[in-house]
């Protein structure tokens, strides 16, 4: 069965809002660490709800996406959140491109050379065979979210 995560956009929005708010209080450290923690918690919630309730991942993540979007609006009181110019490392150059490339290579490394990546490929190829090989399928599905 295919696993689809429809909450990625809401995850990015909520993590970005948290990052902007954290940068005001904690500087660069908050700007980097806060969205990582927020995204991890959101992924953990998605995975646990999917595994425990045995509902399609499409439905679970779509419903949770609405909750995350509502939290985003509640957090900002419906107003725009803008990152301070002092935290824009390369001025107007899209630092997102650099960060996206770093994230891509990191994820590619994890998927190709670690146990988590190998198990993820095994579960994606054939979940029954992966389970028969001794892979804790539920655990690695949660990690994948």
Kindly label every feature range from the protein language model.
Residues 1-25, 48-51:
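Single transmembrane alpha-helix segments in multi-pass membrane proteins
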Residues 2-4, 26-27, 53-55, 114, ...:
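Membrane-helix interface residues
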Residues 13-17, 39-40, 65-66, 104, ...:
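Residue-level recognition of pore/gate-forming positions within transmembrane alpha-helices
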Residues 16-17, 63-73, 129-134:
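Small-residue-rich segments of transmembrane alpha-helices in multi-pass membrane proteins
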Residues 17-22, 44-48, 70-71, 104-109:
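Alpha-helical transmembrane segments of multipass membrane proteins
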Residues 26-65:
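Alpha-helical transmembrane segments within multi-pass membrane transporters and channels
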Residues 29, 33-35, 41-46, 93-145:
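Helix-loop-helix "hairpin" substructures at the membrane interface of multi-pass membrane proteins
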Residues 53, 57-115, 140-143:
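Transmembrane helix-bundle core of multi-pass membrane transporters
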């Amino acid at each position: 069965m295919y696993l689809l995560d429809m909450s990625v956009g809401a995850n990015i929005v909520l993590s970005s809002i948290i990052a902007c708010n954290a940068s005001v209080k904690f500087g660069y450290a908050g700007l980097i660490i806060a969205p990582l923690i927020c995204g991890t918690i959101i992924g953990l919630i998605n995975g646990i709800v999917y595994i425990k309730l045995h509902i399609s991942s499409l439905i679970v993540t779509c419903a949770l996406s609405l909750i995350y979007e509502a939290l985003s609006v509640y957090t900002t009181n419906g107003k725009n959140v803008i990152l301070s110019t002092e935290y824009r490392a390369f001025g107007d150059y899209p630092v997102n491109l650099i960060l996206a490339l770093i994230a891509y290579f990191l994820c590619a490394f994890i998927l190709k050379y670690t146990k988590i990546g190998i198990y993820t490929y095994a579960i994606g190829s054939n979940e029954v065979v992966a389970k028969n090989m001794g892979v804790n399928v539920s655990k690695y599905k949660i990690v994948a979210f």
